[in-house]
């Protein structure tokens, strides 16, 4: 499906891969080149856009603390938020290697996914189906993910790092191709 739209150069034929198309507010998890999970996402606002980048997810952090970037502290006076209902990361985040403090995560504001225009974050990607993504990434069941959440703050390394591409395609296939 995606290969017919010229996106195939970015998608590996084997293994797991995550593609986030910034302007369509969508994430697709692929296994062996085939979509296995689609999710609405929230991306960066016009003043703090989500950058295009290539990275890898190496762990899932459960009940993470939110720590603002140095720029957020300086410009907005923001302070760290411990795990809990006020934490904008929600119950889990996907740790990624990059220098821009960008990662995928859950959210404590689920109602925002109902909006058609979802450029609302500081640049990170909020994933509506974060628990399903965690289950897929960890080769775990939804019940196992819930059990990991119930154990408090901790990180679980992935069995294998998952490549992630944050891209900006103005033409992008939907579920019907």
Question: For each predicted feature, which ranges?
Answer:
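N-terminal pre-domains immediately preceding structured catalytic cores
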Residues: 1-177
């Amino acid at each position: 499906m995606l290969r017919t739209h010229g996106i195939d150069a970015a998608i590996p034929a084997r293994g797991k891969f995550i593609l986030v198309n910034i302007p369509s507010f969508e994430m697709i998890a692929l296994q062996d080149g085939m979509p296995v999970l689609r999710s609405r996402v929230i991306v960066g606002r016009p003043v703090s856009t989500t950058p295009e980048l290539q990275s890898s997810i190496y762990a899932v952090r459960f009940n993470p603390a939110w720590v603002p970037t140095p720029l957020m502290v300086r410009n907005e006076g923001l302070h760290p938020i411990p795990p809990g209902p006020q934490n904008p990361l929600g119950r889990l985040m996907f740790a990624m290697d990059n220098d821009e403090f960008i990662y995928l995560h859950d959210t404590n504001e689920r109602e925002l996914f109902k909006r058609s225009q979802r450029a609302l974050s500081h640049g990170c990607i909020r994933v509506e189906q974060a628990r399903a993504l965690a289950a897929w990434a960890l080769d775990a069941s939804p019940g196992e993910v819930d059990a990991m959440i119930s154990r408090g703050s901790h990180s679980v390394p992935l069995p294998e790092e998952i490549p992630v591409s944050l891209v900006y395609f103005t033409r992008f296939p939907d579920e019907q191709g």
